Amino acid sequence: MTTLTHIPQGTPITLESIGKRYGNRTVLDNLQLRITAGQFVAVVGRSGCGKSTLLRLLAGLEAASDGTLLSGNALLSHAKDETRLMFQEARLLPWKKVIDNVGLGLRGHWRDDALQVLDTVGLADRANEWPAALSGGQKQRVALARALIHRPRLLLLDEPLGALDALTRIEMQGLIERLWQQHGFTVLLVTHDVSEAIALADRVLLIEEGRIGLDLAIDLPRPRRKGSAKLAALEAEVLERVLSPPQGIEASRQGIKASRQGTATSRRVAN
């Protein structure tokens, strides 16, 4: 297996007062975030909290309702060509062979580069096969190769391992971590798997009520040994916070409960 060469260093990111609304529904609310170049950040939170929305804003697929997205002193949109997004589904074109899926949209002499990135993810020998012949994990490796061929400085991962079996998922986690260590691009990983977030990231963010509710540095040496006491303690800390209702939601629940109790008391007095 060869390594991909000449990937530039990661993209630094600054989000200033980012808001995102869909009609009357606010998904992100005055979100503030700074990510240094080359950092590996995992984003967790309940379903519908805005994790994937954040990635779409960073990828330039949607525009923020409020605020500014920056890379250094320039708008992040200027780095769009150096940004790649991977989804839970590999999204390979079934009528194109593996190597052609990797080089999708490229012009000129790209086939040698495509073979190189396929070798990087361990699939050079499958270059001329059809996607239907690949397993789910292999399809995601092809999707990763398709991202790598563009020499990304920012890699956005939206639950790319969520549909894989446990063993394949661990293998893919190791591959992503090795490539990140070798090439230094910035990574944002959205995941529902807290153990995955702790195993891979330098930093874990929890989004709740449209804002960063927790920003936890994962100061553990790599490679991280699964089952270690420190890893388990961090997993428990993040999981407890994810499962705890945000203060605003809890206050709303208490208000509703008090209102109902007050109404019930009034009825008893009236009777």
Swiss-Prot record:
Region span, Disordered: 250-271
Main EC class the enzyme belongs to: translocase
Binding-site positions, ATP: G45, R46, S47, G48, C49, G50, K51, S52
One Gene Ontology term, aspect cellular component: plasma membrane
Subcellular location, record wording: Cell inner membrane
UniProt biased composition (Polar residues): 260-271
Principal cellular location given in the protein's record: membrane
SMART domains for this protein: AAA (SM00382)
Membrane topology: Peripheral membrane protein
InterPro entries, sorted: AAA+_ATPase, ABC_transporter-like_ATP-bd, ABC_transporter-like_CS, ABC_transporter_ATP-bind, P-loop_NTPase
PANTHER family named among the record's database cross-references: ALIPHATIC SULFONATES IMPORT ATP-BINDING PROTEIN SSUB (PTHR42788:SF17), TAURINE IMPORT ATP-BINDING PROTEIN-RELATED (PTHR42788)
Function summary: Part of the ABC transporter complex SsuABC involved in aliphatic sulfonates import. Responsible for energy coupling to the transport system.
Similarity comment text for this entry: Belongs to the ABC transporter superfamily. Aliphatic sulfonates importer (TC 3.A.1.17.2) family.
Protein name per its UniProtKB record: Aliphatic sulfonates import ATP-binding protein SsuB
Organism: Yersinia pseudotuberculosis serotype I (strain IP32953)
